Regions:
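Cytosolic/stromal cytosol-facing helical appendages immediately following the last transmembrane segment
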Residues: 2-16, 28, 43-44, 48-66, ...
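N-terminal signal-anchor transmembrane alpha helix
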Residues: 17-36
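Small-residue packing motifs within transmembrane alpha-helices
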Residues: 20-24, 90-95
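Short, charged cytosolic
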Residues: 32-46
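A general structural-boundary detector
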Residues: 35-36, 95, 119
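Alpha-helical transmembrane segments and their immediate juxtamembrane boundary regions
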Residues: 67-71, 92
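Hydrophobic, membrane-inserted alpha-helices
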Residues: 71-78
Length: 168
């Protein structure tokens, strides 16, 4: 039987702990993103987010300020982690990872801002795409549905919500 040095085992456990923080943050960011989208972007921060719901020319919109803020939070957490609060750098990496996935999927797949815009190919991506289209179906900031990014309720539920909100 081969025995491993204790330092190697501790190092492996430390890396597993860090990876758990990273992936846990990625998952938690869906909840944070959903709440921020619903209550900040469609609430008091609508003045910045409105550009995302209206036709515009060019690649940039005032809504991109939210992505810059997310990047600053991620960078700040990584910096704090490097300054001695080690787990925070992995939280920052998870926040940054969520931001990268957001840009790739949201801007590339949902809004097709990339030169070679891919189309959703599987049931999961098609559901997210359709939910996002329903989110944009309601004019203005009130009455929207599906504020999440990586999770969308079943389409039949969202369609019922849209119909109910149109008749208010």
């Amino acid at each position: 039987m081969v025995t491993l040095p204790t330092s190697l085992l501790i190092s492996d456990c430390y890396m597993l702990f860090n990876l758990a923080i990273l992936f846990g943050t990625l998952v938690a960011m869906e909840g944070v993103g959903t709440l921020a989208h619903k209550y900040i972007m469609h609430g008091w921060g609508w003045w910045l987010h409105r550009s995302h719901h209206e036709p515009h020319l060019g690649m940039l919109e005032t809504n991109d300020v939210y992505l810059v803020a997310l990047a600053l939070v991620a960078a700040g957490l990584v910096a704090l982690g490097k300054a001695g609060y080690a787990p925070l750098q992995w939280v920052g990496a998870g926040v940054a990872g969520y931001g990268v996935l957001y840009v790739l999927a949201h801007d590339g797949l949902f809004h097709r801002h990339w030169p070679c815009a891919p189309k959703p190919v599987n049931r999961y991506l098609k559901r997210l795409y359709r939910a996002h289209r329903l989110h944009h179906a309601m004019p203005g900031r009130k009455g929207s549905v599906s504020f999440g990014f990586f999770y969308a309720p079943p389409l039949r539920v969202l369609k019922r919500q849209v119909q109910a909100r149109k008749h208010r």
